[in-house]
Amino acid sequence: MRNKKNIIITLLLVILMFTLTGCSKDPEDLVRPITGFTEFWDIFVYPMAGIMWIVGKTIGFGNYPLTIIFSTLIVRTIAWPIYGKTNDMQLKMQLVQPEMEKIQKKYEGKDDETSKQRMSMETMQLYKKYGIGLGGCLMPFIQMPLFIGFYRTISRMPYSIKEAGNWIGSVFKTTQIFGIDMVLQQNQGFNELGEIIEATGWTNQKIGVLVLAILVGITQLISIILSNMRQKKQQENQVSDIPEYRRPKQTEQQQMTAKTMKFMLYFMAFMMVMFVWQSAAGLGLYWVVGNIYSTFQSWLGQVGTEKRLEKLRKKQMNKGRIQ
């Protein structure tokens, strides 16, 4: 089960990576003003742009950087219930893991069709017992349209602001914060940093974008490290009452999966830094705020993890379902 979960997460990261790099029919999709429906992702872009329009008109005071900050917090908060459902599903998976391992051990080495069907049936009964459904596995997918839509909105916003009379671009009266213009773009692709600086010299804008890129990398790495620490602690708690010599060891496949996951996560952090360097500065601000808020969100969720886990245990015991 853990391998399946890791595979799902890996697929999510791969899909997200290809989407963020703008893999679409038209490479110009991310450099168009937000006007008219011309691609599938516009379904998600316009609601996000609408949020930014409202924020820019009200608490953003026509300030584009402030609007990015407030809008990011609002969108992440909207997705918070989905995060909570995902976290609860992870807790249930912790409860089910010992019984799941018993089923796997029971049918270990049995490749006949009858054994496979029985194992599948017992697994489904176990999931039903703990209230685990397919919907819980789909929760991360539900978040993705929100975040991808907002990413594409931020990417296209500079072109909307530059377009005269654009419905959302005209809302913003200023696009700078701390001397950094959030709509300017490096337009240097993935060229080496030294060559860019040598050619154009150090400017406040380039220093600011570089700082944002570094902050994106740092905040993303902190989020990854803290997540790994939480996962390790949860795994240790799960087998804390089992003597060390009886604790299950990771298989070679599980170790390879874990290494692949770590590589994907760190590679994602690196790519985010590169995207910020070659994109408008607003993207960097969006990711920094999003990373910090997500880390806080995860920490806040961790605070109540043990209480929710204990509550789930008691609930199952009261129903007489835990032997």
Language-model segments: residues:
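Helix-loop-helix
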Residues: 2-15, 19-323
